[in-house]
């Protein structure tokens, strides 16, 4: 346990240092590329501030993707609840910087003349590579942010909120062509290029590996299916899962997991559960206050339905 605690402390320290080092690096490259010098003039100063806010936003945007990629060392060191809180803070900060970046760039290119802002936006969209895609990505991120506000989130089912949240990945992906084609800081030096490509590759790789491939591989390997559904009380339902060699499935009693019921409508929605019986026992029971919601949307999962389960624990 002492060794695990030491490893977790080291992971938290390295994560914090890496976050700040990344922001310092992109700031350094901005300065080296004349960012501070450009502040001497009105128009160039606005676009220069637009560039640095865009760099900070892009860096934090990819960091928050990494934070919620289900990377086991991060999950173990911070815990999912704490990671979610950090993700929320970093995400909103990145979004505010993104909006600031857009406003400063548009006003800077319009030379501070509000009367030509609309024509400037049209010029950027039609004559600068990747800008239209970037606007589309921004629209996706705006939708994610709006649905993340507590007042809006309370009105949404968890499954619907989770599905809408996935559009954030589309928003991130649509920003890449803009950085490649018009972002001078992205390609200004070999070091900057290596840094950005490494950050993009790390974000994409961890998401594909831990959020997509691993759940699918585990579901195929362990052949998870619904063995039965038992109503425990008015608002609690137990879903019993069965499968192949569940003693090797790295899940523990008390753990939070997401389950998708693949062979029924609504299979794209992840349903949150807590695992009540350890994998490897005759059945793995998952309890959640979800029965009434299923009855009115996707239907209560029936025995035999194929499942995809996502959850991570430290390997023994």
Residue ranges of model-derived segments:
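Short, intrinsically disordered terminal tails adjacent to the first/last structured region
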Residues: 1-2, 244-245, 249, 312
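Membrane-embedded alpha-helical bundles of multi-pass integral membrane proteins
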Residues: 4-208
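Ferredoxin-reductase
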Residues: 50, 216-306
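Short, flexible micro-motifs
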Residues: 57, 257, 314
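Short, surface-exposed secondary-structure boundary micro-motifs
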Residues: 95, 262-264, 312
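Canonical alpha-helical transmembrane segment with a positive-inside/aromatic-interface signature
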Residues: 157, 191-198, 209-231
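A short, basic/flexible loop-to-alpha-helix module at the beginning of a structural domain
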Residues: 309-316
């Amino acid at each position: 346990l002492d060794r695990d605690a030491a490893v977790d402390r080291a992971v938290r320290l390295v994560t914090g240092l890496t976050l700040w080092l990344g922001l310092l690096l992109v700031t350094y490259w901005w300065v080296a590329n004349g960012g501070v010098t450009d502040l001497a003039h009105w128009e160039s100063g606005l676009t220069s501030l637009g560039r640095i806010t865009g760099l900070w936003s892009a860096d934090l945007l990819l960091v928050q993707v990494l934070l919620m990629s289900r990377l086991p060392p991060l999950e173990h060191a911070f815990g999912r609840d704490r990671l979610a809180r950090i993700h929320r803070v970093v995400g909103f900060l990145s979004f505010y910087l993104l909006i600031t970046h857009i406003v400063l760039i548009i006003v800077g290119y319009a030379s501070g003349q509000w009367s030509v802002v609309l024509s400037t936006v049209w010029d950027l969209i039609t004559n600068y590579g990747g800008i239209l895609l970037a606007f589309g990505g921004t629209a996706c991120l705006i939708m994610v942010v709006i649905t993340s506000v507590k007042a809006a989130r309370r009105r949404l089912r968890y499954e619907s909120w989770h599905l809408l949240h996935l559009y954030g990945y589309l928003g991130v992906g649509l920003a890449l062509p803009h950085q490649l084609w018009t972002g001078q800081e992205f390609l200004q030096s070999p070091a900057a290029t290596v840094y950005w490509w490494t950050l993009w590759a790390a974000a994409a790789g961890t998401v594909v590996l831990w959020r997509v491939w691993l759940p699918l591989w585990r579901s195929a390997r362990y052949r998870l299916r619904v063995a039965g559904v038992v109503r425990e009380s008015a608002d609690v339902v137990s879903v019993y899962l069965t499968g192949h060699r569940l003693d090797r499935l790295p899940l523990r009693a008390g753990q939070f997991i997401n389950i998708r019921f693949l062979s029924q409508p609504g299979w794209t929605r992840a349903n949150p559960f807590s695992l009540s019986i350890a994998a490897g026992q005759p059945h793995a029971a998952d309890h959640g206050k979800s029965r009434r919601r299923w009855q009115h949307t996707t239907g209560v999962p029936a025995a035999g339905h194929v499942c995809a389960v996502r959850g991570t624990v430290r390997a023994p």
